[in-house]
């Protein structure tokens, strides 16, 4: 556990992590402060941050399981201690960390007797198992257990439907939220009209990301939600803004596509996903909303095409070109 003495600045707004600990692989805790704030601001920020932490951060879960010769979810399998339902509930609890987009496949193939744990899950490289010791099943006899899995990254909840059983597979209720809990409290200090506030924010996560990472992601998501309001104001000043705005050379993306193909002949561009480019969240979200999922999708767009994307700015195009040049050395 890490603790720091709380110090309050009376001049510059600042935040600090004052306590951080890892209780176990699936429970991390962090306590943060933001100060100094004017009276009322701490509650405004605290409420918004708590809602963003609990509802706006994506997580990764197992959402479907498939195995042969299972008549229904509540059946039992000879040689396995747990029922099918209990195995599905254990799979629901597996904590995963990933940067994938959409769904991916994984599988379990184990032979008894012995315990089947999370370390027996064979997953894509983009998916990391947080706690390999999580229990799935116990095989009492020398039998094989093979289960196909579907892994998905999303936010909030996913509740299985009665008509959602397909091809002998079983949907699993998923809780995508990596933040287990978040609380905020306020400490006031000062006298009279000069009273100020310190916001204390406590975050518990499931280990798929740290409380600090959760705080950063929630903050970015809140900023993204407010960008349309800023964009609307910018449009009213569009003509004045354009007089001072720098521009890029026109339509450079097709040239870069040709050079990238020349420099990286061995790479299939359609198999390079933009998830791998470490894009800023705002740019990444804009591209995803426009169905740009791979490097090939991106490089087939002109600068004019990109500028038509909602909330996409000339500065974003510049930053995107810089990232491409960094990753692929485009001259």
UniProtKB/Swiss-Prot annotation:
GO MF annotation list: DNA binding; DNA-directed RNA polymerase activity; protein dimerization activity
Recorded domain comment: The N-terminal domain is essential for RNAP assembly and basal transcription, whereas the C-terminal domain is involved in interaction with transcriptional regulators and with upstream promoter elements.
Family, similarity comment: Belongs to the RNA polymerase alpha chain family.
NCBIfam families the record matches: rpoA
Entry's Gene Ontology BP terms: DNA-templated transcription
Main function: DNA-dependent RNA polymerase catalyzes the transcription of DNA into RNA using the four ribonucleoside triphosphates as substrates.
Subunit-level organization: In plastids the minimal PEP RNA polymerase catalytic core is composed of four subunits: alpha, beta, beta', and beta''. When a (nuclear-encoded) sigma factor is associated with the core the holoenzyme is formed, which can initiate transcription.
Region Alpha C-terminal domain (alpha-CTD), annotated ranges: 265-331
Statement: the UniProt record of this protein carries the keyword Chloroplast: yes
Lineage: Eukaryota, Viridiplantae, Streptophyta, Embryophyta, Tracheophyta
Cellular compartment(s): Plastid, Chloroplast
Species this protein is from: Vitis vinifera
Main location: plastid
Catalytic activity: RNA(n) + a ribonucleoside 5'-triphosphate = RNA(n+1) + diphosphate
InterPro entries documented for this protein: DNA-dir_RNA_pol_insert, DNA-dir_RNA_pol_RpoA/D/Rpb3, DNA-dir_RpoA, RBP11-like, RNAP_asu_C, RNApol_insert_sf
HAMAP family xref list: RNApol_bact_RpoA
Primary gene name: rpoA
Signal peptide: none
Protein name according to UniProt: DNA-directed RNA polymerase subunit alpha
Pfam families per the UniProt record, alphabetical: RNA_pol_A_bac, RNA_pol_A_CTD, RNA_pol_L
Keyword Plastid: yes
């Amino acid at each position: 556990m890490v603790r720091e003495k709380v110090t309050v600045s009376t001049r510059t707004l600042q935040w600090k992590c004052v306590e951080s600990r890892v209780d176990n692989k699936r429970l991390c805790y962090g306590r943060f402060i933001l100060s100094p704030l004017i009276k009322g601001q701490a509650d405004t920020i605290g409420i918004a941050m708590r809602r963003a932490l609990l509802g706006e951060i994506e997580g990764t879960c197992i959402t479907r399981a498939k195995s042969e010769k299972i008549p229904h979810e509540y059946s039992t399998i000879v040689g396995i201690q747990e029922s099918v339902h209990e195995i599905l509930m254990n799979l629901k609890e597996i904590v995963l960390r990933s940067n994938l987009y959409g769904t991916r496949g994984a599988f379990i193939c184990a032979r008894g007797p012995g315990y089947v744990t999370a370390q027996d899950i064979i997953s894509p490289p983009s998916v990391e198992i947080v706690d390999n010791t999580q229990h799935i099943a116990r095989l009492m006899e020398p039998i094989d257990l093979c289960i196909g899995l579907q892994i998905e990254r999303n936010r909030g909840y996913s509740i299985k439907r009665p008509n959602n059983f397909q091809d002998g597979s079983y949907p699993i209720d998923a809780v995508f939220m990596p933040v287990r809990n978040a609380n905020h409290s306020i400490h006031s200090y000062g006298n009279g009209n000069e009273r100020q506030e310190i916001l204390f924010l406590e975050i518990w996560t499931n280990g798929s990301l740290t409380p600090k990472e959760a705080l950063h992601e929630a903050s970015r998501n809140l900023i993204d939600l407010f960008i349309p309001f800023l964009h609307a104001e910018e449009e009213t000043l569009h003509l004045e803004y354009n007089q001072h705005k720098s521009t890029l050379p026109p339509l450079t993306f097709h040239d870069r596509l040709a050079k990238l193909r020349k420099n990286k002949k061995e790479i299939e561009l359609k198999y390079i996903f933009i998830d791998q480019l470490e894009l800023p969240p705002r740019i990444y979200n804009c591209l995803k909303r426009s169905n740009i999922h791979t490097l090939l999708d991106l490089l087939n767009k002109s600068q004019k095409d990109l500028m038509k994307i909602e909330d996409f700015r000339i500065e974003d195009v510049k930053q995107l070109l810089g990232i491409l040049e960094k990753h692929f050395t485009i001259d």
